[in-house]
Amino acid sequence: MKNGKKIAVLLLTSSGLFPGVSQAADTIIEITGRVIASPCVVNGGQEKLSVDLGSDIQADTLSAAGAASPWKPFTLSLTNCPKSTTSFSVAFSGTADDNADYYKNTGSAANLALELTTQDETNLKNGTTLQNLIIDTASHSYDLNLRAHAVSKGDVTPGTIQAQVQATFTYQ
C-alpha cells in the first residue's frame, strides 16, 4: 500500500511538469460598436418631393440641342435636427442620360434630359455628393436650395417629362 500512495503522490506532483496538458489559453473579448449622428426630418417627413416643370412647355422652344425650359427652383428642407447633429452630406443618384451631366427622361417626350443643380449652379449629376453642409445651430435646420429644368438634345417631341433622383443623407 505504501508504494501505491507514493505512486499517487508522484503522479499528482508530476502533472505540474506538463502545463500544456491541462491549461487553456487566455482569450481577449473585444467589444465594439459605433455611435452615429441622429437624423434630421427631411422634406417634412414626406418620402417624395415632386417638382413640376410645368404642363405648357412648348416643343418649338426645345427644337435646338441645348435649349432648355425655365429653371424650376425648389427647396429640400432639413428640420428638427438634433443638437448633436452639426453637419451632413447628401449624395444624388438616378438614371444618367447619355450625357452624364443630366438625368434620363423616362417620360414619353423624346430627345430631352433633365438637369439638377444647386441655386449657385453646382451640377448634381448622378453620383455627385455635397459634403459637410453645416446645419444652423440656432434653428437646427438647413434649406438646400435646388433647381431643375429640361434640356433639349435636339428635335424634342411632345410628351411627358419624368425622372427620379434619390437623395441619400449622411449625418455628422
Where are the model-predicted features located?
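Mature extracellular/passenger domains of Gram-negative fimbrial/pilin and adhesin proteins
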Residues: 2-6, 20-172
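Bacterial N-terminal signal peptides
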Residues: 9-17
